[in-house]
Every structure is written in structure tokens, then in C-alpha cells.
Amino acid sequence: MVLLVVDTQKGIVDERLYAFEKFVSNIKELIRTAREQGIEVVYVQHDDGPGTGFSIGDDEFEVYSGFAPLLTEKRFVKTVCSAFKKESGLLEYLTEKDEKDVMVCGIMTDFCINATVEAGFEHGLSLIHISEPTRHAQIS
């Protein structure tokens, strides 16, 4: 089992999220529990490309401090909605580990979470979408 934490980056984890405090609390608890149970926590970050302010090297790209990965935890970068596009390397990583069970939480339920869950099923993974700690941000 792996806990996949999708797009919980500084640039979109803020008060624009519905029930922000509850979302933060739920994600923290989920990550803490996974770690305590020996479940690997894997992070996926979205990169909009150079010059967008939401790319590798930009502060907004970094994972929200309340959910910060441990130095030993894996991070993958995606440039499209699905975390399982070949470029991210996530699918290959899970395949090498022979890991088929994935819990998913994070941001942009209607886009990145949905695309990741659908693609995961298409690749033969067993996915659990944890609905409470996912949100859709009102980005303007």
C-alpha cells in the first residue's frame, strides 16, 4: 500500500480551499497515520513550466509546509493532470516495487485527482480515493 499525496503545493493550499482548516487537519492525520503504519507516502507535484511561478525552483511549487515530505520520501513531478503519465516516473516506480494498492488524496478533485485515479485503474492498480482530504481550489 502507498499513500499518494497529489498537488498539495504552497501555491494552492490556502484559504481558497473549501473547509481549509479541516482539509489541512485531515491530510496531516492521513500522512501521520500512514507513516505510523509503515505505509509509504509518495508525493506528486504539478509543474506549470518555467516562468509561471509554479515550477521547479519556485516557492509556490514546494509542498505545503504542513505536509512536507520527509527526506526519505519520494517525490514525482508531473506536467499534466494524471500522475501516471510516463514522464513522471511514478508508474514505473510502483511497477518496480510490485505495488498495486494506492490511496489517493490531494488537490484539484475534478482534474488531477480524477485523472490520476482513472489512469491508475487503466494501468491495473487498485486505487482508494479518500474523498474527505481532497479539494477543488477556486483558482482565479
Model-derived regions: residue spans:
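Short beta-strand-loop elements within alpha/beta enzyme cores
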Residues: 100-106
